[in-house]
């Protein structure tokens, strides 16, 4: 059984202290045993190895590896990968995240074409592009996102593009640049309920993130919007329901809810493992509140089954519009 996978242990890249900003923090409690419902297959298939080879050959970074995603074996076996642009070093230090923190390197201006070439070689029908936070850049990396989307459109015109962005806090005009590139899905994760932001996501602002998602719809109503949260961080059910209402007020289409898994003893503790029946209850409630699509399971992650979910999103929108069109 594998839960949080250390796929970086054989990484040929130079070793750096992964979380220097967390070194001074007291150790957090670590759950000795994970419940039976959190089980994943360890990676190692031929398709997984081929996907890894293409990623390595192009010198690319994937959030699948950097964040220790438990679904990497399943996704890479299907040749699904979430590419992380603008380097592997984040300017923020969220208490839940396994991505390293520090001063990032300069942007690789050839990266958009490298990503696009990999997408074409993997034959991806749907690709997810995410990034570290780049508060050091004037536009937060918005133009780099736009160039990456454009490069994928040129190299693989049939591929739909989903982006998972940072919040572009205090980066005027950045969001407009990204939306103008016309991704098919715009995802920005709230991550947790507002009461937990100071301890879980201290560099962000909850209502700024909600407004970011709302603004995407105002700029281009055709773009699907999506957001995700983790549970098991000490949130209350009523707080999660209020978060759903906040997202619906921003006209967000798709909500993902998954179990938080602790990357190390220096990260936020797992307050509890939420049982599958509670995830099902969240899913039922979210659909009742009007989301087009909801994915709520212990192993749900933002990019998990993203291609299949995009097809389901399209079908859900069409079903919603059909009665109005026939009236």
Curated annotation (Swiss-Prot):
Residues 76-292 form the Radical SAM core domain. One of its GO terms (cellular component) is cytoplasm. Belongs to the radical SAM superfamily. Lipoyl synthase family. [4Fe-4S] cluster 2 binds at residues 90, 94, 97. This is Lipoyl synthase. HAMAP family: Lipoyl_synth. It is an enzyme of class 2 (transferase). The keyword 4Fe-4S applies. Binds 2 [4Fe-4S] clusters per subunit. One cluster is coordinated with 3 cysteines and an exchangeable S-adenosyl-L-methionine. Gene3D superfamilies: Aldolase class I (3.20.20.70). Pathway: Protein modification; protein lipoylation via endogenous pathway; protein N(6)-(lipoyl)lysine from octanoyl-[acyl-carrier-protein]: step 2/2. Disulfide bonds: none annotated. Residues 1-32 are annotated as: Disordered. SUPFAM superfamilies: Radical SAM enzymes. Its main location: cytoplasm. [4Fe-4S] cluster 1 binds at residues 64, 69, 75, 303. Residues 8-32 have a biased composition (Basic and acidic residues). Its EC number is 2.8.1.8. It comes from Methylobacterium radiotolerans (strain ATCC 27329 / DSM 1819 / JCM 2831 / NBRC 15690 / NCIMB 10815 / 0-1). One of its GO terms (molecular function) is metal ion binding. It catalyses: [[Fe-S] cluster scaffold protein carrying a second [4Fe-4S](2+) cluster] + N(6)-octanoyl-L-lysyl-[protein] + 2 oxidized [2Fe-2S]-[ferredoxin] + 2 S-adenosyl-L-methionine + 4 H(+) = [[Fe-S] cluster scaffold protein] + N(6)-[(R)-dihydrolipoyl]-L-lysyl-[protein] + 4 Fe(3+) + 2 hydrogen sulfide + 2 5'-deoxyadenosine + 2 L-methionine + 2 reduced [2Fe-2S]-[ferredoxin]. It is found in: Cytoplasm. Pfam families: Radical_SAM. Its cofactor is [4Fe-4S] cluster.
């Amino acid at each position: 059984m594998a839960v949080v996978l250390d796929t970086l242990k054989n990484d040929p890249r130079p070793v750096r202290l992964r979380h220097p900003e967390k070194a001074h923090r007291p150790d957090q409690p670590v759950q000795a045993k994970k419940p039976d419902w959190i089980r994943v297959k360890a990676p190692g298939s031929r398709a997984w190895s081929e996907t890894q080879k293409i990623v390595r050959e192009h010198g690319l970074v994937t959030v699948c590896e950097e964040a220790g995603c438990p679904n990497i074996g399943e996704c890479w076996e299907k040749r699904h990968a979430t590419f992380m642009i603008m380097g592997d070093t984040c300017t923020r230090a969220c208490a839940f995240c396994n991505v390293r923190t520090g001063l990032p390197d300069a942007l690789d201006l050839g990266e958009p074409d490298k990503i696009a070439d990999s997408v074409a070689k993997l034959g991806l029908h749907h690709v997810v592009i995410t990034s570290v936070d780049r508060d050091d850049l004037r536009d937060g990396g918005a133009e780099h996102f736009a160039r990456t989307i454009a490069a994928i459109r040129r190299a693989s015109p049939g591929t739909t593009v989903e982006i998972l962005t940072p919040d572009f806090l205090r980066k005027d005009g950045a969001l407009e640049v990204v939306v103008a590139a016309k991704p098919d899905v715009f995802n920005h994760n709230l991550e947790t309920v507002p009461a937990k932001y100071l301890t879980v996501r201290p560099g962000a602002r909850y209502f700024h993130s909600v407004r970011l998602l709302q603004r995407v719809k105002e700029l281009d109503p055709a773009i699907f919007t999506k957001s995700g949260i983790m549970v098991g961080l000490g949130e209350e059910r009523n707080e999660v329901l209020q978060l759903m209402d906040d997202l619906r007020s921003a006209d967000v289409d798709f909500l993902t809810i998954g179990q938080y898994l602790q990357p190390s003893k220096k990260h936020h503790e797992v307050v509890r493992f939420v049982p599958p029946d509670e995830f099902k209850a969240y899913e039922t409630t979210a659909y009742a509140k009007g989301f087009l699509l909801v994915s709520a399971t212990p192993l749900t992650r933002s990019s998990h089954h993203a291609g299949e979910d995009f097809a389901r999103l399209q079908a859900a929108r069409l079903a919603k519009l059909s009665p109005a069109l026939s009236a």
